[in-house]
Amino acid sequence: MTELARLKFYATQPHTCSYLPEEQATTLFLDPSQPMDVQVYADLSDMGFRRSGDHLYRPHCQNCSACVPARIPVNLFVPDRQQKRILKRNADIQVSSAKPVFTQEYFDLYQRYIEQRHADGDMFPPSREQFSTFLVRDLPFSRFYEFRVDQRLLAVAVTDLLPNGLSAVYTFYEPDEERRSLGRYAILWQIGEATRLQLQAVYLGYWIKNCKKMNYKTQYRPIELLTNQRWVTLY
């Protein structure tokens, strides 16, 4: 913690929240001149920070506490009946690890995903520059996990490999493959991978009760939520 005490942070001016438009958001960022050390990143993850591009951040809102950091303690996780069906349905998928680079194949999939699933969000319209700035970063702990069937790319789970767990940065997938539930499958796969690597948790970002796109995370039980600076387990 001594190392963390020396870090500098900066807060943004209040701005419209991208998850709850009726709220004003403030974001706390780690000083961008600070090298992104993997141990510092891991320690900050335990304090509710996330990575976006080259930045580590967490919500720092004055009048709202809706964004609750969430993680899955993988040694306690047991898939429910629906999750077992998703795992079985996707048993034909092969997963491989790749470096985070720009390829036309990745971008085409990302573009289809944003256009069909998030056309109402602040990431629309997708662009090559946006994709690269957000996801294609030359960081030693970052991975693109490719999900393929017969060489066809179905999904990419952008994941950070930390000493204390896997951080699920972002997943984009083939929007026409609804039956496969690829977003949920990617999380289940990350849980399995963290277990295989003997890591403690999968960090899912923020659970937001009143935001449909962010409240799905409590479907994975048990889950730990960071409340009053303490991780609380929900079974």
Curated annotation (Swiss-Prot):
Keywords: Acyltransferase, Cytoplasm, Transferase. GO terms for cellular component: cytoplasm. It comes from the Bacteria. GO terms for molecular function: arginyl-tRNA--protein transferase activity; leucyl-tRNA--protein transferase activity. InterPro entries: Acyl_CoA_acyltransferase (IPR016181), Asp_Glu_LeuTrfase (IPR017138), N-end_Aminoacyl_Trfase (IPR030700), N-end_Aminoacyl_Trfase_C (IPR007472), N-end_Aminoacyl_Trfase_N (IPR007471). Pfam families: ATE_C, ATE_N. GO terms for biological process: ubiquitin-dependent protein catabolic process via the N-end rule pathway. Transmembrane segments: none annotated. It catalyses: N-terminal L-glutamyl-[protein] + L-leucyl-tRNA(Leu) = N-terminal L-leucyl-L-glutamyl-[protein] + tRNA(Leu) + H(+); N-terminal L-aspartyl-[protein] + L-leucyl-tRNA(Leu) = N-terminal L-leucyl-L-aspartyl-[protein] + tRNA(Leu) + H(+). Its main location: cytoplasm. It is an enzyme of class 2 (transferase). It is found in: Cytoplasm. Its EC number is 2.3.2.29. The keyword Cytoplasm applies. Functions in the N-end rule pathway of protein degradation where it conjugates Leu from its aminoacyl-tRNA to the N-termini of proteins containing an N-terminal aspartate or glutamate. Belongs to the R-transferase family. Bpt subfamily. This is Aspartate/glutamate leucyltransferase. It comes from Pseudomonas syringae pv. tomato (strain ATCC BAA-871 / DC3000). The gene is bpt.
